[in-house]
Regions:
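Active-site-proximal substrate-binding core of FAD-dependent oxidoreductases
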Residues: 43, 203, 360-363, 394-427
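Conserved beta-strand-loop-beta-strand element in the redox core of flavoprotein oxidoreductases
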Residues: 131-147
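Flavin-binding catalytic cores
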Residues: 187-197, 252-271, 300, 314-344, ...
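Internal hydrophobic alpha-helix adjacent to the cofactor/substrate pocket in enzyme cavities
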Residues: 65, 382-405
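A glycine-rich dinucleotide-binding beta-alpha-beta segment and adjacent secondary-structure elements
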Residues: 310-376, 404-417, 533-567
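Extended, charge-enriched "interface" segments that sit outside catalytic cores
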Residues: 434, 440-442, 446, 451-567
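Conserved N-terminal/central alpha/beta ligand/cofactor-binding core
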Residues: 7-8, 23-129, 144, 152, ...
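Beta1/beta-strand and adjacent pyrophosphate-binding region of the FAD-binding site
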Residues: 4-19
Length: 567
């Protein structure tokens, strides 16, 4: 094939999913001339599985991405259909924001952002090879012969490398949602000396919402919480948000699965690759948890301009006929019509023990990797890695020191540290239990932890930085007010209404919080902090309520940091 130069660039990003988009934007926004290669322009920022952003621990990642100057939180807020705060009945450390998003709008808004970003060129094409010289990356060759000379390459191919989809006996060499797969880059990775293995994930069927009966199901409305992005101040009212619905599998659902395990690819030998432990198929759940009479399902809208409904919790690779029978056993789905059948997908990924904490490969300088090719699962984990890979590539290109976030600084630090020091034998999912300093790594203080770092690296815009400084000052003012004295008579009446004895003289608002009085009650009774955003107020409340635990956690983090730096 005749090759030709496509022009010289600072960096090439291979893949335009959630990792690739963040990587390309981080590079371009910090002044690096960047190309992003995608197999299909219509798959930029595509959500091949769940139509949502955030969730337990994942919401923390999105807020951290945003605090550093990334795009996922901004785009999620633009396209959100519904917000909810998960684990509200638990402690502040594990509460996580989640949003249902409009899948098509998420793609189009992300594509628009890329198209209007200075220093960034988008090209549709498949990366065929990585060029190197003397142990350093020098460029990328495409399947059509175009050559992109560059000094940094970020591989963010998601689940597309040698992908194949499986639905019963029907096996297709394809990427998610029928998109073309990438067939050439695995050979380049093997040639460069990297290990490649096979992982597997899956997705549920999409239903025609007109054939779903929600009248007898439990509605899950949206909530008036705070947005993902620190650039935004508010979210739509509950009444303007789109509801989801709760339903369950039953004994008949389970019988169909158990009676047909010989036709289930996961159990008849068709699929042998490793799947995600924390997002199992319905077949796996029914077999592994045989004592459970039912499994929870959520019916989630795919968008405002489509009738498609995503059935969270009913991922499967059963044959088409069994899928139809199985779905119709579920309450509310008795007459449902499937518009997209469920499937499992197998794909190539690397061993992250071959990767440095900067997400640069060990053997080839300037070659980075991010996202599901690193053995992770989830849009948020991918976006976090993409941001860090792009930012570190940019810092290297600009002759600056790399950014390696510690485990006590960010969930992103926990994610990357786990990957490059422990590796993973299954699709890795971020969870709050993985973060030993989770009480200090809350989603409400992500900007305090990371925005200054992002600004110093050149990624946080001046607009975002000024807003951060204003919020920081507001936090300090709020903390000072809460340290001031409350009206004694009103304070006594309040604590007695909570079944507590009267207070001694000179009580402060902070004293009331330490006694378990919610800040929202203080705002209502005393009329304080009327204009302070909810997340700022709650952040200050958490710092007071868990003051002793936070002090201990920060002391432990300092001790661990000293041990790591001691020769």
């Amino acid at each position: 094939m005749q090759t030709f130069s496509e022009g010289t660039y600072d960096a090439v990003v291979i893949g335009a999913g959630h990792a690739g988009c963040e990587a390309a934007l981080a590079l371009a926004r910090t002044g690096c001339r960047t190309v992003i290669l995608t197999l299909n322009l219509d798959s930029i920022g595509f959500m091949p599985c769940n139509p949502s952003v955030g969730g337990t621990a994942k919401g923390h990642l999105v807020r951290e991405i945003d605090a550093l100057g990334g795009e996922m939180g901004v785009n999620a807020d633009k396209t959100a259909l519904q917000y909810r705060m998960l684990n509200e009945g638990k402690g502040a450390a594990v509460q996580s924001l989640r949003a249902q998003t409009d899948k098509n709008r998420y793609h189009t808004e992300m594509k628009r952002t890329l198209e209007h970003t200075e220093n960034l060129r988008i090209v549709q094409g498949e990366a065929a090879d990585i060029l190197t010289e003397n142990g350093h990356v020098t460029g990328v060759v495409t399947s059509y012969g175009g050559v992109f000379p560059c000094r940094a390459v970020i591989i963010a191919t998601g689940v597309y490398l040698n992908a194949r989809t499986i639905t019963g006996e029907v096996i297709a060499d394809a990427g998610p949602n029928g998109f073309a797969r990438a067939t050439m880059l695995t050979k380049a990775l093997l040639r460069l000396g990297y290990q490649v293995r096979r992982f597997k994930t899956g997705t549920p069927a999409r239903l025609d919402g007109r054939t779903v009966d929600t009248s007898a199901l439990t509605m899950q409305p949206g909530e008036k919480v705070y947005p993902f992005s620190f650039l935004n101040d508010d979210v739509p009212a509950e009444s303007a948000q789109t509801p989801c619905y709760l339903t369950y599998t039953n004994a008949e659902t389970h019988r169909i699965i158990l009676d047909n395990l010989d036709r289930a690819p996961l159990y008849n030998g068709t699929i042998s690759s490793t799947g995600p432990r924390y997002c199992p198929s319905i077949e796996t759940k029914v077999v592994r948890f045989a004592d459970k009479e039912r499994h929870q399902l959520f019916l989630e809208p795919e968008g405002a301009d489509t009738t498609e409904v995503y059935v969270q919790g009913l991922s499967t690779s059963l044959p088409h006929d069994l899928q139809k029978a199985m779905y119709r056993t579920v309450k509310g789905l008795e007459r449902c019509e499937i518009v997209r059948y469920a499937y499992a997908i197998e794909y190539d990924c690397i061993d992250t023990l071959d990767v440095l904490p900067t997400l640069e490969f060990k053997k080839v300088a300037g070659l980075y990797t991010a996202g599901q090719i690193n053995g992770t699962s989830g849009y948020e984990e991918a976006a976090a890695q993409g941001l860090m890979a792009g930012l570190n590539a940019s810092l290297q290109l600009r002759g600056k020191s790399p950014l390696i976030l510690r485990r006590d600084q960010a969930y992103i630090g926990v994610l990357i540290d786990d990957l490059v020091t422990k590796g993973t034998d299954e699709p890795y999912r971020m969870m709050t239990s993985r973060a030993e300093y989770r009480l200090t790594l809350r989603q409400d203080n992500a900007d305090l932890r990371l925005t200054q770092i992002g600004y110093d690296c050149g990624l946080v815009s001046e607009e975002r930085y000024q807003k951060f400084l204003a919020r920081k000052a507001l936090r300090e003012e709020t903390a000072a007010l809460l340290a001031s004295r409350a009206d004694q008579k009103a304070a006594d009446a309040l604590v007695q209404s909570f079944g507590q004895p009267p207070l001694s003289a000179g009580v402060t608002y902070a004293d009331l919080i330490r006694r378990g009085i919610p800040l929202m009650a203080l705002r209502e009774i005393f009329g304080i902090l009327p204009k302070v955003p909810t997340d700022v107020a709650l952040s200050c409340e958490t710092e007071i309520r868990y003051e002793g635990y936070l002090k201990r956690s920060r002391t432990e983090a300092e001790r661990a940091k000293k041990m790591e730096t001691t020769p």
